[in-house]
C-alpha cells in the first residue's frame, strides 16, 4: 500500500500515526 511505502521511505507515517493518536 502507499502508506507502507511512504513509511519505508521516511518515518513520517509512523510519526503521523503517533501524533494523530
UniProtKB/Swiss-Prot annotation:
The compartments listed are: Secreted
Keyword hit for Hydrolase? no
Q: Where is the signal peptide?
A: none
PROSITE patterns from the UniProt entry: HISTONE_H2A (PS00046)
GO cellular component term of the entry, any? extracellular region
Tell me the GO BP annotations in alphabetical order: defense response to bacterium; defense response to fungus; innate immune response; killing of cells of another organism
Q: Which family does it belong to?
A: Belongs to the histone H2A family.
Q: What is this protein called?
A: Buforin-2
The record lists the organism as Sphaenorhynchus lacteus (Orinoco lime treefrog)
Query: What lineage is this protein's organism placed in?
Result: Eukaryota, Metazoa, Chordata, Craniata, Vertebrata
